[in-house]
Amino acid sequence: MYPTNPMRAETSGDTERVIGNWPSIKKRRDELIIATKVTGEGHKFVREGAPISASTIQSAVENSLRAMNTDYIDIYQLHWPNRGSYMFRKNWQYDPTGQDSAAFYDHVDEVLDQMDELVKAGKIRYFGLSNESAWGTSVWVQAAKAQNRPRVVSIQNEYSLLCRLFDLDMAELCHHEQVDLLAFSPLAAGLLSGKYQGGANLPEGSRMSAMPALGGRINGKV
């Protein structure tokens, strides 16, 4: 797995196009597991920052299939919950009290219906979540069971020696509901690699050169 992120408008979608240009993509497709995501609010250069919905998923899947020159996607993931997330060190300021529970339940039903259509059409095989909480994941899991819709097979959340949030209620939930963790930032954006050396001799082009706080991983105590 080679995770990437469209940090700029001019590079958005480049990874999918690179995969689509692999000479062996068609010949060895059954040997590959390809995962990609639909993003929502946050990246204004992708569908003008529209939230995740059935229509944005449909459009994004078709675009990804064309870009990657493939007939199907193995794991299709929701990049962010529309209601917000505590990832990237926002766990101490995350406040769910203003969220609309009914709107979220309706959103889950709508998206599960869309995922069901895509699975039946052979365009995706499985779907997963990303940057989701234990409560949010449990809603997706239970709704899929109740409606006989495609179940959540994976969740891509941060996990490293410096970020152990998953070890709490998420680990228990994922164990019992058979949801696999696809950990991102296992080296804490490079902090655990030792290459930053306290900010001295900062490697050109590194994450820290572009984001000195490394997504909240560097603060007054770290």
Question: Residue spans of the language-model regions?
Answer:
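N-terminal binding-site loop/beta-alpha segment at the start of enzyme catalytic domains
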Residues: 1-38, 54-58, 71, 114, ...
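Acidic-and-aromatic substrate-binding clefts and catalytic sites of carbohydrate-active enzymes
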Residues: 2-18, 44, 83-84, 134-137, ...
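Short acidic capping loops at alpha-helix termini that bridge into adjacent secondary structure
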Residues: 29-32, 71-75, 125-126, 150-154
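A short, structured active-site edge motif that brings together acidic residues
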Residues: 30-44, 155-159
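Active-site mouth loops of central-metabolism enzymes
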Residues: 42-58, 97-106
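Short, acidic/polar
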Residues: 51-69, 108-113, 137-142
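Active-site groove signature of glycoside hydrolases
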Residues: 65-91
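Beta/alpha (TIM)-barrel catalytic core signal, keyed to glycine-rich beta->alpha loops juxtaposed to Asp/Glu
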Residues: 81-222
